[in-house]
Amino acid sequence: MAKNTVSARFRKVDVDEYDENKFVDEEEAGEGQQGPDEGEVDSAIRGGNMMGALQAALKNPPINTKNQSAKDRAENLVLKVLISFKANEIEKAVQSLDKNSTDLLMKYIYKGFESPSDNSSAVLLQWHEKALAVAGVGSIVRVLTARKTV
């Protein structure tokens, strides 16, 4: 018989360390995320640069933070940009986004559906239609199954 069969070293392995469902508080990683720069977005909207406003609004999303006011501020800013787009410019704007930005846009669209305001539902449905046409059903699945929310 081998000598190491009575060894107890295997008992020192923490199997919970390898569990993918284990809760890990990632608050420290998201401390610096305060959301998109409102001044940059507002100046792009006033200047008529809607594509730049959309890019700026989707930049630096407050995903890893638990600060709800930062998340609400970012949601309102993105919603403001989406509402200010003309209907015929939406498709071109969505096509200019990469895969991650389109998924982030879909997260904001679904977040906007949670709390509808004046005219936001109709505009969000137009954006959803165009984003779905560009990104496909996979984008919806990624948004609905994502653990990190906006």
From Swiss-Prot:
Which compartments does it reside in? Cytoplasm, Cytoskeleton; Cell projection; Nucleus
Q: A Gene Ontology molecular-function term?
A: actin filament binding
Q: Which family does it belong to?
A: Belongs to the ARPC5 family.
Q: Which Pfam families match?
A: P16-Arc
Q: Which GO terms are recorded in the biological process aspect for this UniProt protein?
A: Arp2/3 complex-mediated actin nucleation; cell migration; regulation of actin filament polymerization
Gene3D superfamilies cross-referenced by the UniProt entry: Actin-related protein 2/3 complex subunit 5
Q: Tell me, what does this protein do in biology?
A: Component of the Arp2/3 complex, a multiprotein complex that mediates actin polymerization upon stimulation by nucleation-promoting factor (NPF). The Arp2/3 complex mediates the formation of branched actin networks in the cytoplasm, providing the force for cell motility. In addition to its role in the cytoplasmic cytoskeleton, the Arp2/3 complex also promotes actin polymerization in the nucleus, thereby regulating gene transcription and repair of damaged DNA.
Please verify whether the record's keywords include Phosphoprotein.
no
Q: Specify whether Cytoplasm is a keyword of the entry.
A: yes
Record's superkingdom?
Answer: Eukaryota
Q: What is this protein called?
A: Actin-related protein 2/3 complex subunit 5-A
Q: Name one GO cellular component term.
A: Arp2/3 protein complex
Instruction: From the record, give the cysteines joined by S-S bonds.
Output: none
Q: Where is this region: Disordered?
A: 21-46
Task: Cite the record's note on assembly.
Answer: Component of the Arp2/3 complex composed of actr2/arp2, actr3/arp3, arpc1 (arpc1a or arpc1b), arpc2, arpc3, arpc4 and arpc5.
Q: Where is the signal peptide?
A: none
Organism this protein belongs to: Xenopus laevis (African clawed frog)
Main localisation: cytoplasm
Which keywords are on file for this protein?
Actin-binding, Cell projection, Cytoplasm, Cytoskeleton, Nucleus
